Amino acid sequence: MIVKFIVIIFCTHKYNQLYIKKMKEQITYDIFNKVDIRLGTVISVKKNEKARKPSLVVEVDFGKEIGIKQSSAQITHYYNEENLKGKQVIAVCNFAEKNIAGVISQVLILGSVDSEGKVTLVHPSQKADNGLPIA
């Protein structure tokens, strides 16, 4: 089952409003199968001081096969170092790296974005092994 309203946490409030109003164009299963979505555990969190909008630099352990990857994420409304460290998250692991405010973002952590631009991260309902693929 594909959830229709999961969006990448780097979207803006304006983009979010447009996204909720209209579903994106359909894709084939072949295209979806190219997206490598994995489960990982947050091992470190710090503020991204260079970012224009409040952001966190999050390091996630995706297990032996993928290793530790980092992401710059605009998730500061609900999350901080204390409540995010140790939490399991779901991320797209095979996007090209992107420099975001001086941080090389290697993965895109997934979350839902409400009408005010506040992000709630997607996470498993129970603890699972790092690196497991999401199908």
Q: Which residue stretches match the model-derived regions?
A:
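Intrinsically disordered, low-complexity polyampholyte segments enriched for Lys and acidic residues
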Residues: 4, 14-16, 21-22
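Phosphate-backbone binding interfaces of nucleic-acid-interacting proteins
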Residues: 22-135
